[in-house]
Curated annotation (Swiss-Prot):
It is a single-pass type I membrane protein. GO terms for cellular component: membrane. The keyword Hydrolase does not apply. Residues 1-19 form the signal peptide. It is found in: Membrane. It comes from the Eukaryota. This is Prohormone-3. The chain crosses the membrane at residues 90-112. The lineage of its organism: Eukaryota, Metazoa, Ecdysozoa, Arthropoda, Hexapoda. Its main location: membrane. Keywords: Cleavage on pair of basic residues, Membrane, Signal, Transmembrane, Transmembrane helix. It comes from Apis mellifera. The keyword Protein transport does not apply.
Length: 314
């Protein structure tokens, strides 16, 4: 407000000087003497003392005193007329400037904007208005705040990830991480070894035995989870024995049949040497259940076991 009043006062001062110069230039214009143009307003100030108003040469010679009085009165009226004209012009201009300044002060001062009413179109990038998520060229009211408004987003600290964050104590790390100091006074945050199911991790080595580090659905984080295995069942194609369900006694074998292309399928085995790849026989948990289409192989050991049972009673 102080700046507006100061600029208005300086403007009024310049207008006053301009009107005075304009009046002087108008008076000093070359006009014909009185009697030729018809009014005394065309007389220049330099001719005022040498001219008389209303007297001819003979009367001026007879009455020198009266001629001087008339000259002085005419000059006074002449000067008063143009002075009054300049004052009127100055008053009109001053009133106009005051009216303009008074209308300029009706604005509302606020932080962050140059408007005095809420308009949804000005905040279309925040979800308001009819544009929705439409991205258009940013206008005057959608530009980011700078230091000229008194606020700035540059002063906000950058978010440092939990992994490999510099630390001196475990409290400086995220939950589930510890501060490991190898050399020097400053260490780095690392995940604990042997993380349980659901805890954050970075590699499979960070998890306990039997768990693997996998991405969480719907986020960018990784946590220790139970490995999802889809062991193949009987007569399903495979590449190595690790793909078959070993708990049911299946391994991957090369199957050859008459007039058919050889293929690798999961099948029951008796000797691990017929399987493709290593087989952990100690993981077989269930009794082998043969199907009706399989060839039943009768173990000789069972007959021997039966004979051994009958021997004492013979």
């Amino acid at each position: 407000m102080g700046r507006v009043l100061l600029s208005a006062s300086s403007l009024l001062l310049h207008i006053q000087v301009f009107t005075r110069r304009l009046g002087n230039e108008y008076i000093e214009q070359d006009r014909p003497p009185c009697g030729t143009s018809g009014h005394p307003g065309s007389i220049r100030p330099t001719e005022m003392k040498t001219m008389t108003f209303g007297l001819n040469d003979e009367e001026r010679a007879k009455h020198p005193r009266e001629s001087e009085v008339l000259n002085e009165n005419g000059a006074a009226r002449f000067q008063q007329r143009y002075t009054h004209m300049g004052q009127k012009m100055y008053t009109c201009v001053a009133l106009t400037v005051v009216a303009l300044v008074s209308t300029m002060h009706f604005g509302v001062e606020a932080w962050g904007g140059l408007f005095n009413r809420f308009s949804p179109e000005m905040l279309s990038n925040l979800g308001y208005g009819s544009h929705g998520d439409h991205i258009s060229k940013s206008g005057l009211y959608q530009r980011p705040l700078s230091t000229s408004y008194g606020y700035s987003y540059d002063s906000l600290e950058e978010v440092i990830p939990c992994y490999e964050r510099k630390c001196t104590l475990n409290e400086h790390c995220c939950p589930g991480s510890i501060c490991m100091n190898v050399d020097g006074d400053v260490g780095h945050c690392v995940f604990e070894l042997g993380q349980k199911q659901g805890e954050l991790c970075r590699n499979d080595n960070d998890c306990e035995t039997g768990l693997m580090c996998a991405e969480v659905a719907g986020s960018e984080t990784r946590s220790c989870q139970v490995p999802i295995t889809s062991n193949k069942l009987y007569n399903e194609e495979c590449n190595v024995s690790g793909e078959c369900d070993i708990s049911r006694g299946l391994c991957c074998q090369l199957q050859r049949r008459h007039r058919q292309t050889p293929r690798k399928v999961c099948s029951y085995f008796k000797d691990p040497l017929v399987c493709i790849g290593p087989v952990a026989t100690d993981q077989i948990k269930s009794i082998v259940q043969y199907t009706s289409g399989e060839k039943r192989i009768t173990g000789q050991g069972n007959r021997i076991f039966k004979r051994s049972l009958k021997a004492p009673f013979a």
